[in-house]
Amino acid sequence: MKALVKTKKGKGFLEIKEMPVPEINYDEVLIKVHYTGICGTDVHIFTDQFPIYYPPVILGHEFSGEIVKLGEKVTSWKTGERVVGECQSLVCGKCRFCRTGHPEACAAKRSPGWGINGSFADYIKMPAWLLHKIPDSVSYREAALTEPAAVSSQALYSRAKVSTGDFVVVLGTGPIGIIIAKMAKIAGASQVLITGIDKDEKYRLLLAQKLGIENTVNVSKVNLKEMVDDLTDGIGADLVVEATGVEPAINQAFDIVRKLGKIAVIGVPGQSRLNVNWSAGSFKALDLCFSFSSQYEDWTRVLKLFENRALDLTDLVTHEFKLADWKMAFDKAIDCQGGKVLFKI
């Protein structure tokens, strides 16, 4: 099979290679990949900015596909069923995190795309227990967005616990930021603002508007704190979701959130140390939570939202490429002048 492989450590070293179709174990299934999305993680591995990965490895973890083969002890699935899969591969099942329903935090976890071979290929194998059925009304194309939507669900619903009536500001117009903003509206937020900078004005801020986020702000031209103060009678935002990972935006979150408010952090900085106005968090007595990965209930929630059309991400996908055109696809994902970039396998 054809696969896009990170062959060794360092910037670049990504190439199409002929790889064997995965051999499945008794508790696994083989999946024919239909669509698979480029995530920031894939970009960071490509540029050698992701802290952990084990080359040679097939990249990719956001996918939708069809079961074509079952392990001998798999009885809960049939060939031909359409599925998506969680990323908690190789978890131990015995540690405190696994036994309390948080396999995403297991130290033994090796996710597809960095720890084990991923979905930028014709086929991927997955443990049967990590699969979710795609509702009949949801296309393979849209289902490929389940993983980033589940990550967004974890940040907003499970970690930040957004409430009806909250004034929410989302910092960052990448796919995750836009999905979180849409989910905040679904949750009944009184207002949702999403912010970008000059480079986002001609595309991503407009894309957010197209996807139903009316209040878009270019913080390169608008004083965000003054704007939030005007809209909240000087109180500040109830919840700020930081989805950029850049230092100015992180500090902006501390400026615009209200006293006793919440900051949810999902953006991953490119550097390990930042200059953050920590005292503002202390004096405001803020709730600060970080979010990474997703849980079972996030996947079931997202698929139900897709099924009943409460969450429609059709327009978030702006570019599709064949795997052979991976260089163009990665260029488009890196230049931030698009929404979600998918490979159609």
Show the residue positions of the predicted features.
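A glycine-rich helix->loop->beta "capping" turn
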Residues: 231-239
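NAD(P)H dinucleotide-binding glycine-rich loop of Rossmann-like/cofactor-binding domains
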Residues: 91-171, 200
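Mid-domain Rossmann-like dinucleotide-binding core that forms the NAD(H)/NADP(H) cofactor-binding site
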Residues: 138-221, 226
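Glycine-rich phosphate-binding loop and adjacent beta-alpha segment
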Residues: 203-209, 214, 247-308, 345
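Glycine-rich beta-strand-centered segment in the early N-terminal region that forms part
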Residues: 22-36, 50-96, 135-137
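C-terminal hydrophobic helical "lid"/dimerization subdomain
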Residues: 3, 179, 222-223, 239, ...
